[in-house]
Amino acid sequence: MLTIGQLARIFEISTKTLRHYDAIGLFVPARTGSDNGYRYYQPEQIEQLSRILALRRLDVPLEAIDRLKRDGALDDPQRLRHFLQRHQHTLREEISARQRLLAELDRTLATLAHWRIRNMHARIVERPAFSVVGMEYFGSAPGDTIGQLWERFIPREHEIAGKHDPEVSYGICAQQPNGEFHYVAGFEVQEGWPVPEGMVRFQVPAQKYAVFTHKGTAPQIAESFQAIYSHLLAERGLEPKAGVDFEYYDQRFRGPLDPNSQVDLYIPIY
């Protein structure tokens, strides 16, 4: 005979599982020691336990397995096959229902994103020229590179002296003639202050801007820029102008992945 420990090892399950099966009458030992309470099983019981565990891996409830056993279907290949076919059909219906639910969730999220973008209001401001000191990136595909630039810059931002407002940082973006862009993560700095090693000073020209407030995560900023240039400006009778646009980060920015973060997007216009 096999001990409960041997049977547990054969099937790589816990003895607690076997004790539970015994307690509910699903799989009982052939003999239980009267003096020590040890459970012993016959080798012939291995096949039945194998079927029980196979059904559990298929997410069949213990109650259903118990009914199969009591009805004799657990040891009847034909009846077990019919049960599994019904279980397969049920799973497919559940998966189909979940897929419909997931599709509805996708539509809801898309609607919320559309609502978030459609409700961006614009205000018109004119700003004089100002200087930004920070770290720069040249490239053609922003992707994760902008985030990586900020990750390198933030640990060094304390090196910048003469900040106009230490609570406000800028993400400056200037398009280059070759199609690439020049991005600077930095702070507005008064003239005359030194530029730390590895950083640059960028002069932002005086300009008229349409200012939209982006609400959402940092990766979603690209979606807001796309909406602004594709239709939001035109819907408001505004015409974009080639120049320097920038992101304005103040205390409303709670972190790059916080959906409640707010960032002002300054778009140069005529």
From Swiss-Prot:
Record domain HTH merR-type: where: 1-71
Annotated knockout phenotype: Abolishes high-level biofilm-specific drug tolerance, including tolerance of tobramycin, norfloxacin, trimethoprim, tetracycline and kanamycin. Biofilms are more susceptible to treatment with hydrogen peroxide. Intracellular norfloxacin accumulation increases in mutant biofilms. Normal attachment, formation and architecture of biofilms. Growth in suspension, known as planktonic growth, is normal in the absence of antimicrobial agents. Increases resistance against colistin, in either planktonic or biofilm growth conditions. No differences in colony morphology or Psl polysaccharide production.
InterPro entries linked to this entry: AraC_E-bd, Cass2, DNA-bd_dom_put_sf, MerR-type_HTH_dom, MerR_fam, Reg_factor_effector_dom_sf
Binding site for 3',3'-c-di-GMP 3: R67, R70, R86
Further information: Biofilm bacteria exhibit a profound tolerance of various antimicrobial agents, rendering biofilm cells 10- to 1,000-fold less susceptible than the same bacteria grown in a planktonic (free-floating) culture. Second messenger cyclic di-GMP (c-di-GMP) has been associated with controlling the transition between a motile and biofilm lifestyle; increased levels contribute to resistance of exponential-phase planktonic cells to tobramycin and norfloxacin.
DNA-binding region residue numbers: 4-23
PROSITE patterns: HTH_MERR_2
Name under which the protein is recorded: Transcriptional regulator BrlR
UniProt-annotated binding residues for 3',3'-c-di-GMP 1: M1, R31, S34, D35, Y40, Y270
Gene Ontology biological-process annotations: negative regulation of DNA-templated transcription; positive regulation of DNA-templated transcription; regulation of DNA-templated transcription
Keyword field: Activator, DNA-binding, Nucleotide-binding, Repressor, Transcription, Transcription regulation
Gene3D superfamilies reported in the protein's UniProt record: 1.10.1660.10, Regulatory factor, effector binding domain
Cellular component GO terms, alphabetical: protein-DNA complex
SMART domains: AraC_E_bind, HTH_MERR
Induction: Up-regulated by the second messenger cyclic di-GMP (c-di-GMP), which has been associated with controlling the transition between a motile and biofilm lifestyle. Up-regulated by the virulence factor pyocyanine. Expressed during biofilm formation, under flowing media conditions, after 6 h post initial attachment and detectable for at least one to six days. Not detectable prior to 6 h, in the earliest phase of initial, reversible, cell-surface attachment during biofilm formation. Expression not detectable when grown in suspension, also known as free-floating or planktonic growth.
Phenotype for R86A: Reduces c-di-GMP binding. Reduces c-di-GMP binding. Drastically decreases DNA binding ability, but binding is still enhanced in the presence of c-di-GMP. Decreases DNA binding ability. Almost abolishes DNA binding ability
Region (Involved in effector-binding, probably including pyocyanine-binding): 120-270
Function description: Transcriptional regulator. Responsive to the second messenger cyclic di-GMP (c-di-GMP) and to the virulence factor pyocyanine, which both enhance gene expression and promoter DNA binding of BrlR. Activates expression of operons encoding the multidrug efflux pumps MexAB-OprM and MexEF-OprN and several ABC transport systems, acting by direct binding to their respective promoters. Also acts as a repressor of the two component regulatory system, PhoPQ. Binds to promoter of its own gene.
Binding site for 3',3'-c-di-GMP 2: M1, R31, D35, Y40
GO MF, one example: DNA-binding transcription factor activity
Native source organism of the sequence: Pseudomonas aeruginosa (strain ATCC 15692 / DSM 22644 / CIP 104116 / JCM 14847 / LMG 12228 / 1C / PRS 101 / PAO1)
Assembly, per entry: Monomer. Homodimer; dimer formation enhanced in the presence of the second messenger, cyclic di-GMP (c-di-GMP). Homotetramer; dimer of dimers, arranged in a head-to-tail fashion, which may reduce DNA-binding ability. Conformational changes upon binding c-di-GMP or pyocyanine may facilitate DNA binding.
